Amino acid sequence: MFKPTVGPIIGHTTTNHARIFLRGKLQDTSLVFAGVRYRRLGEEHWSRGEFVKLTIVRDMSDVIALNELASDTEYEYQAGWFSPMSPVHTVETVQELPLQWPRDIYRFRTQSSKITTPRAYIVGSCRYLRMTAGIPSAPHLGDRIFASIAHLAQRTEPPISATLMTGDQIYVDDLNVIAPDREYKEILSKYRIAFSQPNISKLMSGTPTYMILDDHEIEDNWPANKSKTDDYLYKNAIAAYELYQASHSPAHELLSDGQISRKLEQYWYQFANGDIEWFVTDSRTRRNLSADDRRILDEEQEQALCKWLIHSPARVKFVVTSVMFYPDRKTLGDDAWKAFPEQRLRLLETIRTHRIKNVIFVSGDVHGSLTSRLTHSKDPDFEVHTIVSSPLCNSKLLPYAKASTFILDQPLAKTAAGDYRHELTSQVVSQDNFAHLVVDREHIQVNYHDRDGKPLQTINIPLA
């Protein structure tokens, strides 16, 4: 067996289930299989291998489901791919082969079943990896922050429950106005290179990783900048996104037989860790830019989000939106929620009128990090917070956001019932960074770190 050419990536992980993405390699006309075997840390004997047949339709990649795991337990696993001599093998018959597994042993931990135990998360976005003629130039620049994240994840308590990558995991357009990538094979190559750099590979092989797309997975400011010829680009970019980012997410349903459904109804999804729940929105591909019904989330998604906000018993509710919910930018804000004020106000009024507590909006996009509190002039019980974490690695062509980037001296929205007012609760971080969140009974601690892992600032968001 050979090491995966991309991965393994630990995706959606629960108390008893984990998803592992990996890619092999095309072998002319020969069959190719990928496999995973695992054991509890400290045990001697490996499980039987779980195998999947790889096909060119999925770029020789797939996701393997591990089921009936024990909660809050550390597992070791091995992963690899091979091409058997016989052309008639199946995923059942290859289990009997005397395979020599790759030496690398990876680890992951299942989620705790304790409802109120403290949880920790990593949040980041916008990882620029410069490509020239299909070859990464100075790839270590786009990878080094992941060494710092992996180092933190290995030594911190409570253990990291998940890494949230909230958009622009790759730059399909590469900030290239003259000749951006449009072909499917070019976009696939970008994913392979971006996700196989050593430090991000190490992090994703051991920490459950959840992703959602933003514009650069397609093109800058999509769909506002869409041209008549961009349907071809969109089809290719989305097909690659579905393989490399959505495939291991909860957007794919787990079937009763323990397999992952191939069907993908939408890109938005939910997941839960004890009394903490996440609703990861697709704020990019379901937009409606028409004047009579402008919306950043389609109607089905908005209804699902409001239903979840109102009825979920979760103590803490994180809403991920790849673009900023608030505060608004003074310029270049039309790609974010600023340009969709009616829908934003509907969400805020839902939270306020139903008296929903501990709602946190999490986003990236702006190449600056901050926390901010939103209050209401006539309703002292209303409070919402936002956590922004961006970028993991900036391009030298793009500026970092500063406090002066944002509109902070006027209400976010004015209504007959009162004004929504916001204020920064942190400094604005204007450098490459990531956020380490720790959620306990009393508060959410937001720790921003620079690309070398050094602490930049800590903010405590009180919980009701």
Describe each PLM feature range.
Residues 1-464:
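Metal-dependent phosphoester/phosphodiester hydrolase catalytic core
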